[in-house]
Amino acid sequence: MKKPEKITSRTANFAKWYVDVITQADLMNYGPIKGTIYFKPLGYKIWENIVKIVNAYFVKQKIENVYFPLLIPQDFIEKEKKHIEGFAPELLTITKVGDKNLVENIYIRPTSELLFADYFKAEIAKNNILPIKLNQWSQVLRWEKTTNPFLRNTEFLWQEGHTIHASKVEADQFAKKIARFYKYFLENYLAIPVISGQKTEREKFAGAVNTYTVEAMMQNFRALQSATAHFLGQNFAKNFEIFYKNKENKSQIPFQTSWGLSTRLIGAIVMVHSDDNGLIFPPKIAPIQVDILEFFSKKNQEVKIFAKKIAKILKNAKISYKIDDTDQQIGYKINNSEVHGAPIRIEIGPNEVKNNQICLVRRDNHQKFFFNIDLLKEKCRKILEQIQADLFKKAKIRLLENTVFVNSINEFEHAVKNNKFVIAPFSESPEREQEIQEKTGATARCILPKNSFFALPQTGNSIFSGEKTNKFVLFAKSY
């Protein structure tokens, strides 16, 4: 078995560190085409855990799963030129099958609003029952100019939910509700604190009336748009001529939403929590919560028996585990466990067997605990809970300490140069946003709500025009 290679430090080269971690920790291999990856078992298990948790919420909300075609016909694209404009450079187009040119192009979905609109039209015409709440777990393809594993792939996995409602208020409120769930999920399961808010006109999803987003800070202080929910209004319903009959039997145009999160969350987990030794998983999302390392078990069968006893206790406690019973050296086993990020490792040798004792090590801070095996279930649960809380606390401190308020363009430029998240009074045009991006590299991440955990003043003077505004916008360099 090959010894784990040294991982580049975060301070030396953050981008190289990230790639080192995800490859050496066996999350993925590069695929044969730019922007594609092979999900290895550990990497895919993270996604399976995400799916399980998120799907349970969807079931409670009576959101049903479906699966729609990968291919979109040309006439759908023609109906929604404005919506597809934003995806035009990334749109994969099929023009030929075998040696025959197609009469009309076929497109590979970059997202599925067009398909859901078509489906909703048929279902409402048949049943006239609203709302309809659907979700699909699928893959989409976008020919990205710049790719980065998990964060920006040509092909990636995601969930995209779509609903259709009789009421404008109901639809918009539902989009906001999903955005709140995304915030809850990231903070409570992934231990990633986020800033939530509404996208600006320039940054909102093409075809949406409003886009609600959750933004996270990575360890290099770049923002990552982690999930979004869109209130689509009647934009798609009008173009697809979707109608329902109201209580007075009059034809009305309904309102839609769409919302999604993707495998970029795997990249977020790595970039927020991991260190120069490898992965660090929050326990609630960890594929393996406990690594059991056997030392000298080939010469001492009692070590192996003790490991199985530990495994049985963990299994009964519904704590996931893996036993390393290889004949590798102690240093290798510890290093390998560190790289792969299990929140806890338990080290077992002849001394632990002799004393009926557990040696438990936290992955995040390397703190060691020694206790009798009878306390394993209680101690393990408590320590896993503490790790989850500590990872969130550490990430939130980073977010708060590196988010600043500014009142002028000079302060803004200085803060961005120093890799800060910047909150500024801002009520300018999309052209001003573009100017800021070209000059500083920062983009508007979201308009902060009044109930943000940041103590926002009632009003401020917009940093360009000086006009009084009650709008405060978060800016940052981003992925």
From Swiss-Prot:
Pfam families according to UniProt: HGTP_anticodon, ProRS-C_1, tRNA-synt_2b
Biological processes, Gene Ontology terms: prolyl-tRNA aminoacylation
Principal EC category: ligase
GO molecular function: ATP binding; proline-tRNA ligase activity
E.C. code: 6.1.1.15
SMART domains per the UniProt record, alphabetical: ProRS-C_1
GO cellular component: aminoacyl-tRNA synthetase multienzyme complex; cytoplasm
Family in the record: Belongs to the class-II aminoacyl-tRNA synthetase family. ProS type 3 subfamily.
Oligomeric form and interacting partners: Homodimer.
PANTHER family per UniProt: BIFUNCTIONAL GLUTAMATE_PROLINE--TRNA LIGASE (PTHR43382:SF2), PROLYL-TRNA SYNTHETASE (PTHR43382)
Domain remarks in the Swiss-Prot or TrEMBL record: Consists of three domains: the N-terminal catalytic domain, the anticodon-binding domain and the C-terminal extension.
Function text: Catalyzes the attachment of proline to tRNA(Pro) in a two-step reaction: proline is first activated by ATP to form Pro-AMP and then transferred to the acceptor end of tRNA(Pro).
Protein name stated in the entry: Proline--tRNA ligase
Species of provenance: Mesomycoplasma hyopneumoniae (strain 232)
The encoding gene: proS
